[in-house]
Curated annotation (Swiss-Prot):
Pfam short name (any one): Hemagglutinin
Localisation: Virion membrane; Host apical cell membrane
Protein name: Hemagglutinin
Membrane topology recorded in Swiss-Prot or TrEMBL: Single-pass type I membrane protein
Glycosylation sites: N30, N46, N249, N335, N431, N503
Post-translational modifications: Palmitoylated. In natural infection, inactive HA is matured into HA1 and HA2 outside the cell by one or more trypsin-like, arginine-specific endoprotease secreted by the bronchial epithelial cells. One identified protease that may be involved in this process is secreted in lungs by club cells.
Covalently lipidated residues, kind S-palmitoyl cysteine: C566, C569
Cysteine-cysteine disulfides: C22-C486, C60-C286, C72-C84, C105-C147, C290-C314, C493-C497
GO cellular component, one term: virion membrane
Further remark: Major glycoprotein, comprises over 80% of the envelope proteins present in virus particle. The extent of infection into host organism is determined by HA. Influenza viruses bud from the apical surface of polarized epithelial cells (e.g. bronchial epithelial cells) into lumen of lungs and are therefore usually pneumotropic. The reason is that HA is cleaved by tryptase clara which is restricted to lungs. However, HAs of H5 and H7 pantropic avian viruses subtypes can be cleaved by furin and subtilisin-type enzymes, allowing the virus to grow in other organs than lungs.
Length: 570
């Protein structure tokens, strides 16, 4: 009779526990590893690369007003050596300088060359205006074999002023130019350093030569330094070029008595442009906004590992070749044994496995959403995604890449290492600063991605917990948590009942009476099982005590009757 009652109780217990609903999240067999603030190599369901490594080995110029300077150097467009004759005036928003380009024909250099190059790269092109200088008592047609066109010539935008006759007196002269335009004027002039004192006397007459230039913001005097130098282009002399930006309504004045290379036209900047030094081929079939010496970077990513000196609208250069940004939840691949041996897994882990946090295992079959339910009842088993929690997580994660780009995007300009001897210290400082910035941004990039990854994983876990709490609040005392993300329901719950739990329309009062009755039956079985264990342990303890007591009594009787003797030796 007792056996029959126990069997009935166990049958009721098993029947009640047959209905179950579990919460789970999407998983894949092979996820992507990302780093967070607290841990490296966490596997997530989805992730995207944030560091661009693909380079287009061409200058993509589609949609750009591009000028390829070829053999002409950018600074040469302002003074006009023969190789720059076609570029004395131009308009462009992309300026390409080639390695073969040269700024000068007669040997010499530009003062503060790199700053002027930067100004011209951003200029959008240049236009010119005649300065209106006229000269009497001097020749204005100085020329040299170093600047050949069809014959010896000179810079197209400059006048080489000479004495009227060899060794003749060069008169003291003063010339002024007022900028009547609304934008600054670029004014360039030169100082000629003859190859010898005799040559200087022949060209400009005897005596010391002095050139003074001034405006409201500038004043400088120059004295030529004649003397032998190594020949370049057949010339032992040198011409050094100087420049200033003349504000609107300001006037520049030149006072000189020889060795002066006079400007003929002032240059005005047209607008804005990008300038790049590259020997890469132009391609009108592709578009780009970020350029470097090796070509074009076309990317929507926030970082790049291609060239630290790219210019334009570019991703930030970082030292890392890869920084993965999590765009999905933490991945816990479904155990392969679960796929192959369902019955074994039911015995080992239950029907569904475990999920997020306390919910340890993911579901690879949950393809319609990030979160969902699996249930088991008399009608069978089923899986359904929860779209609301999925969308909530997606809405908060969407745009992470764009936010990273907003934090890092910047227009970059090219600062080269083409420094003269005087500027080398400045060049070293610029290079050191650039290297330091790269170090800082490499660290910042890693930190930013790690912060976003931490937020994504915490966020997706939070949505999972919200969903779990929603189900728990609905079921109340009608179900019991098993600690693995599942609820064992104490009443018959068909597919409509399961759907009401998922839809948040479950009425716990409707099933309360049945659930309480089944819970009492289950608790009774658990209670009987508990008493049985206590009795077992009590019986075992009592038996041991009784055995020891009998053994001690027998030993005492034997010793008393002389049948047993105890000898103690010291």
């Amino acid at each position: 009779m007792n056996t029959q009652i126990l069997i009935l109780a166990i049958s009721a217990f098993l029947c009640v526990r047959a209905d179950k609903i579990c919460l789970g999240h999407h998983a894949v067999s092979n996820g992507t590893k990302v780093d967070t603030l607290t841990e490296k190599g966490i596997e997530v369901v989805n992730a995207t690369e944030t560091v661009e490594q693909k380079n287009i080995p061409k200058i993509c110029s589609k949609g750009k007003q591009t000028i390829d300077l070829g053999q002409c150097g950018l600074l040469g467009t302002t003074i006009g050596p023969p190789q720059c004759d076609q570029f004395l005036e131009f308009s462009a928003n992309l300026i390409i300088e080639r390695r073969e380009g040269d700024d000068i024909c007669y040997p010499g250099k530009f003062d503060n060359e790199e700053t002027l190059r930067q100004i011209l790269r951003k200029s959008g092109g240049i236009k010119k205006e005649n300065m209106g200088f006229t000269y009497t008592g001097v020749r204005t047609n100085g020329e040299t074999s170093a600047c050949r066109r069809s014959r010896s010539s000179f810079y197209a935008e400059m006048k080489w002023l000479l004495s009227n006759t060899d060794n003749g007196v060069f008169p003291q002269m003063t010339k002024s130019y007022k900028n009547t335009k609304r934008e600054p004027a670029l004014i360039i002039w030169g100082i000629h350093h003859s190859g010898s004192t005799a040559e200087q006397t022949r060209l400009y007459g005897s005596g010391n030569k002095l050139i003074t230039v001034w405006s409201s913001k500038y004043q400088q005097s120059f004295a030529p330094n004649p003397g032998p130098r190594p020949q370049i282009n057949g010339q032992s002399g040198r011409i050094d070029f100087y420049w200033l930006m003349l504000d609107p309504n300001d006037t520049v004045t030149f006072s000189f008595n020889g060795a002066f290379i006079a400007p003929d036209r002032a240059s005005f900047l047209r607008g804005k442009s990008l300038g790049i030094q590259s020997d890469a081929q132009l391609d009108n079939n592709c578009e780009g906004e970020c350029y470097h010496i090796g070509g074009t970077i076309i990317s929507n990513l926030p970082f790049q590992n291609i060239n630290s000196r790219a210019i334009g609208k570019c991703p930030r250069y970082v030292k890392q070749k890869s920084l993965m940004l999590a765009t999905g939840m933490k991945n816990v691949p479904e155990n392969s044994t679960h796929k192959q041996l369902t019955h074994h897994m039911r015995k080992k882990r239950g029907l569904f496995g475990a999920i997020a946090g306390f919910i340890e295992n993911g579901w690879e079959g949950l393809i319609d959403g990030w979160y969902g339910y699996r249930h088991q009842n008399a009608q069978g088993e089923g899986t359904a995604a929860d779209y609301k929690s999925t969308q909530s997580a997606i809405n908060q994660i969407t745009g992470k890449l764009n936010r990273l780009i907003e934090k890092t995007n910047q227009q970059f300009e090219l600062i080269d290492n083409e420094f003269n001897e005087i500027e080398k210290q400045i060049g070293n400082v610029i290079n050191w600063t650039r290297d330091s910035i790269i170090e800082v941004w490499s660290y910042n990039a890693e930190f930013l991605v790690a912060v976003e990854n931490q937020h994504t994983i915490d966020l997706t876990d939070s949505e999972m917990n919200k969903l779990y709490e929603k189900v728990r609040r609905q079921l109340r005392e009608n179900a019991e948590e098993d600690g693995n993300g599942c609820f064992e329901i104490f009443h018959q719950c068909d597919n409509d009942c399961m759907a009401s739990i998922r839809n948040n329309t479950y009425d716990h009062k409707k099933y309360r009476k049945e659930a309480i009755q089944n819970r009492i039956q289950i608790d009774a079985v658990k209670l009987s099982s508990g008493y049985k264990d206590i009795i077992l342990w009590f019986s075992f303890g009592a038996s041991c005590f009784l055995f020891l007591a009998i053994a001690m009594v027998l030993a005492f009787i034997c010793i008393k009757n002389g049948n047993m003797r105890c000898t103690i030796c010291i």
